[in-house]
Amino acid sequence: MTVIRSEALTLEQLKAEHPTMTHLIISPGPGHPLKDSGISIPAIDYYAGKIPILGVCMGLQCITVNYGGIVDQAGEYVHGKTSPILHDGKGLFKGLQQGVAGTRYHSLAARINSLPDCLEVTSRTEGGIVMGLRHRDLVVESVQYHPESILSDEGKLMLANFLSWNAGKWSDLPDALTPAGSHVPHAASTLAPA
């Protein structure tokens, strides 16, 4: 694994210095994705469809704006607080129980009514704030909360799910989008708009 600051190099340098990259994680950071994300958005645009991409916090926001959605005030400021996460049981969430605790550090979120058709909501808070997005065709997943936080549940399983993917298109990974049986009671109803 190599950690690279998004403002430390250009996309061309990233491609030249890491020609065999197998996965891309766009990690958290302060600010707004349109002003403060370095090469994150161009990297998403370039690598989408080639390798799996995971966005965390600002990473979700970068994915949102890359595909034409809007990131705006979430309506609440949460820093270091946990919320139950209602999810679809697929992709990153495969094998996770409903209501898994997610640690949140954000004041911005994807505006639900701005999302393009290519992105689907995969998880929400009980109050309806978007906590996860997935590209419908490309292996691009994201969460607004921090699965790597000590206060979040099942972060290791989510990372294992992501690292198990070896393609850039969901059509090449059909099992990834098949829910893991009994772990997802009434997933469709839990993701209905609040």
Would you name each region that the model predicts?
Residues P28-P33, G59-Q61, P147-E148:
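Short glycine-rich anion-binding loops that position phosphate/pyrophosphate groups of nucleotides
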Residues T20-M21, I41-A48, L54, Q61-D153, ...:
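Pocket-forming structural segment of enzyme catalytic cores
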Residues M1-L54, Y67:
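Flexible gly/pro-rich beta->alpha loop and the following alpha-helix that scaffold active-site loops
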Residues P33-D36, G59, V78, G155:
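Short, conserved glycine- and acidic-residue-centered signature motifs
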